[in-house]
Regions:
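Alpha-helical transmembrane segments of multi-pass membrane proteins
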Residues: 3, 11-12, 16-691, 697, ...
Length: 714
């Protein structure tokens, strides 16, 4: 993707930013008679930009350390939401202190402490060793690296809006909230198109740290201006026609909490669904988060973007369509599924945030309002990041959230009916919805997880695994599959002869099948395999061979031993090493592998950290002089051949591409593409078939510090 092609959305975002700041300051200066409003506008905008720029930055930084799983982003979002809640709580408590000068002094002191924790570059000591809980380690890593700066950035929005209402009496602070969301949106749009392709991860972290220092100085100026402002009894009185005070609304804080929590759940659940079988990359994290923020901008900017009755109808239709799509599963195309999921997320966020705006209080309760909203967002993060993996064995949080949103839609529609309002108290409506949602929760917990053909289901930090019984369509042979999401990671036929037959991506006609059948046939071999799956490659082991599997997911190891016999049936000596393969190989002494296999891709998701120059140096250290590196690059969405060819060229190896066609080997093979790399041409001549490709191809260099999947998008 050329930089010029990325200018248009970035230019539009920058224009929108300056227009919004100019519009806000012009209106505010006219009403308050104070020209200092631009300082508050720029400070809040900068804080929001930094707040959302650091999220993909740090998530990408640590992604290689924790196996490249979507759960890394979910845990990062959870930690950031909890810090956001902490920042809002701090702003709420600080605003209760009567003296403006005391508030300014406390905040200035904390800003100074935060500046001392820079830069936000994660220390190598935080890399996992393999025997700790990844979720806890990610939490501690983020708190140690960016906890204090992020906490203070989170507090900036509500705190400066409160200070602004004192320094510029007569002006509404709520437009500052829309302005902050524009800053957040610009951060998200600019990251994948500007900062990620142009700067290394370390350079991004240092640049962010410098911008934080500039923000801190600007914030100190705002605090000084507030300290100099005279004490006032009011905080501004401009209200939109739909604004209601807390006393006018039944159960106001419960509604604020629910309406903030549901979009948060939908955001994380939708992101999981989209990333699970495409790629764990900032670009795909950012699209849902951008839609989430855009709904905030539109609803808080003006009530003209939210029309209640049409939005209720649109939301109900969108929710029903998404439920139907999820029930049909793979019958819908991938592009259609993603478009519907993202469209539904935006509609739901518009509905929930539009209702939040209708219920917003006067500025006197501003910090309490934002605190409750952030509590709802944090509760949604906890529900998806911690509660759902403990309670559900599948990804049921999305359908459950869809049901909850539909109930809120119905309840909102009924509350507009005056006759219904007279007959049914608000608490009764809330209780009825809670009961129905509880019944759905029981269904997903107790019944939906037990399909008749599913032998076992496990869910952990790395995703959902299933072992299923099935039959081969061509000849009705009974078989057993290990499935991650909707992708088969290993298959074994259960009849006596078929249990020793390799299939799917590892059949005898595949690139890896040809290699393991022919290479060094006259002597014992040492074989390394990154990614266990069902253990299919163990069937290629001969007496005297040693096969060493590396597997990051402990549930994969458990299911492979429990439900498949490949490991037990192999004639080779088998070792299964738990932990991230790259980290384990980096710590191990040289293994002198004759063949090293990279097959750690979950569906079409790409663990980028396994295809960088730094990773390649580790593999080369463990290969024998005539060793072959076999890399599985089958993928619907990304062309990984340029990346692998770059690795081969950098290491002085020859690279060949071996393809296998669906239905080969008696109908048991899948379409597969393997790349074989070696410094010994004779070894490749033996391993590759006559159809292996050696055609020249463009190259794309990836390093740990600088890589971009947009460069290899098909």
């Amino acid at each position: 993707v050329r930089y010029d092609a990325r200018r248009i959305p970035l230019r539009s975002a920058i224009v929108l930013t300056f227009v919004s700041i100019e519009r806000f300051t012009t209106m505010t200066d006219r009403r308050s008679g104070d020209s200092g409003s631009i300082l508050f506008a720029v400070t809040i905008f900068t804080s929001a930009f930094l707040l959302f720029q650091v999220q993909p930055l740090l998530a990408k930084f640590i992604l290689p350390w924790f196996g490249g799983t979507p759960a890394v982003w979910t845990m990062c979002m959870l930690v950031f939401q909890m810090l956001l809640f902490g920042g809002y709580a701090y702003a709420h408590l600080l605003s209760r202190i009567g003296s403006n000068s005391r508030q300014a002094l406390i905040h200035a002191s904390l800003l100074t402490i935060a500046a001392l924790t820079l830069p936000v570059v994660p220390a190598a000591e935080w890399k996992p060793t393999g025997d700790e809980a990844p979720g806890l380690r990610i939490t501690l890593l983020l708190l140690a690296t960016v906890g204090m700066p992020y906490f203070l950035l989170s507090s900036t929005g509500p705190l400066l809006q409160n200070w602004f209402s004192k320094a510029c009496p007569g002006a509404s602070p709520y437009r500052l909230y829309a302005l902050s969301n524009i800053g957040s949106l610009l951060a998200l749009i600019s990251y994948p198109f500007v900062f990620e392709p142009l700067f290394s991860s370390t350079a991004q972290a240092w640049l962010w740290s410098v911008l934080f220092l500039i923000f801190a100085l600007s914030c100190l100026m705002c605090s000084w201006k507030t300290a100099m402002a005279p004490a006032t009894s009011g905080t501004g009185n401009e209200e939109s026609p739909t604004t209601q005070t807390a006393d006018d609304v039944p159960l106001p804080r419960v509604r604020w909490l629910i309406l903030a929590m549901l979009p948060s759940i939908m955001l994380l659940a939708t992101t999981n669904e989209v990333c699970m079988n495409i790629a764990v990359v900032p670009f795909l994290w950012i699209i849902p988060l951008t839609l989430y923020l855009l709904s905030f901008i539109l609803t808080f900017e003006s009530d003209r973007f939210y029309r209640r009755r049409p939005m209720i109808l649109l939301t109900a239709c969108s929710l029903c369509a998404t439920m139907l799509m999820l029930s049909r599963g793979s019958m819908s195309g991938v592009v259609f599924q993603i478009a519907l999921l993202l469209g539904n997320l935006f509609v739901v966020c518009m509905f929930c945030h539009g209702e939040l705006v209708r219920l917003k209080p006067d500025p006197k309760q501003l910090t309490a309002f934002y605190l409750t909203m952030s509590a709802g967002g944090a509760a949604g993060g906890l529900a998806v990041g911690l509660l759902a993996p403990l309670v559900f064995k599948g990804y049921f949080e999305l359908p459950l959230a869809l049901v909850a949103c539909l109930l809120i839609c119905i309840g909102t529609f009924l509350r507009d009916d005056k006759q219904f309002q007279q007959r049914v108290p608000p608490r009764t409506t809330l209780n009825m919805g809670a009961v129905l949602l509880g019944l759905c929760f029981i269904y997903f917990t107790c019944f939906a997880q037990h399909a008749p053909d599913v032998l076992d289901v496990k869910r952990n930090f790395y995703g959902v695994l299933r072992v299923e019984n099935d039959v081969l369509e061509s000849n009705a042979r009974p078989m057993r599959d290990m499935v991650h999401g909707c992708v088969v990671h290993g298959r074994q036929f259960v009849d006596q002869d078929g249990r020793y037959q390799p299939s799917t991506y590892y059949s005898q006609s595949s690139g890896i099948g040809r290699t393991l059948l022919t290479v060094d046939a006259d002597r014992p071999r040492r074989i390394g395999v990154v990614g266990l799956g069902a253990g299919t490659l163990a069937v290629y082991g001969r007496s005297g061979d040693a096969i060493r599997f590396y597997e990051i997911n402990p549930d994969v190891i458990d299911l492979a031993r429990k439900h498949f016999t490949f490991l037990d049936d192999s004639h080779a000596e088998i070792d299964v090493i738990p932990g991230d393969a790259r980290l384990v190989l980096d710590r191990e002494t040289d293994q002198n592998f004759d063949v090293l296999v990279l097959d750690a891709f979950s569906g079409d998701a790409i663990p980028v950290h396994l295809l960088t120059s730094e990773a390649m140096r580790i593999y080369m250290r463990h290969l024998s002089d005539r060793g072959i590196l076999a890399i599985h690059i089958s993928n619907l969405y990304f062309d990984l051949e340029p990346v692998v060819r770059a690795l081969a060229a950098e290491s002085g190896l020859e690279a060949r591409v071996q393809k296998c066609v669906q239905g080969s080997d008696g109908g048991v093979a899948f379409n597969s593409v393997w790349m074989l790399l070696s410094g010994d041409t004779s070894a490749l001549n033996v391993a590759c078939g006559p159809d292996a490709s050696t055609a020249p191809h463009r190259v794309v260099y990836w390093t740990d510090d600088h890589n971009n999947l947009l460069n290899v998008l098909r």
